[in-house]
Amino acid sequence: MRTKLTIATHAILTILEIIALVYDIYSFGIAMFSYYTIDSNILQMLVSAGILYCLLKKKEGTIPVWLSKAHLVSAVALTVTFLIAALVLAPQEGFSYYFLENVAPINHFLAPVLSVLSFLFLGIGEKLPKKAVFAPVDATLLYGVIVLLLNAVRVVDGPYFFLKVYETAPSTIVMWFGIIAVLCWVLSAIYCWIRRKNA
């Protein structure tokens, strides 16, 4: 039963993420990769497709540790996307844009919910090592550093206010990096703990 639910959930996620990706390519082109939200959703699409492959094609029908770790990264990243959109960006720029228009319901709500629920309660495969808890932090900081550098050399602008190096005080940038890194670690630790309890 769990395997069937996992397959159904990730099939839905894959379809939703493909729809969102097509729209994002049309809307942003190559610039879409500067968005943490879009990167997180692309990762989830790849993770879900990988899980489907493992469960439908491979004889053992289990998910390898590296793929479960990637799912942890996408689940945490999508949660951060939801929280930042809901608590920081939407109050500044409008709720409708971040949660109701175009593919925003997928990127900011449906994908995060399905990703987290499937990671917590539908995990199949070997247990994650304890050090996996740092994977979402590492991935998020890597994204932040890369986009910050691209802002510094004026290749991209933003896309988030705390990445605009020429408009934001260094202390504000450091503060937001710290807040998001801690948030990623806390979410990751909670998710790993709940997943172990439901294994």
Residue ranges, per PLM feature:
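Juxtamembrane "helix-exit" motif on the non-cytosolic side of transmembrane helices
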Residues: 22-30, 86-96, 152-153
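Membrane-interface capping segments at transmembrane-helix boundaries
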Residues: 57, 189-199
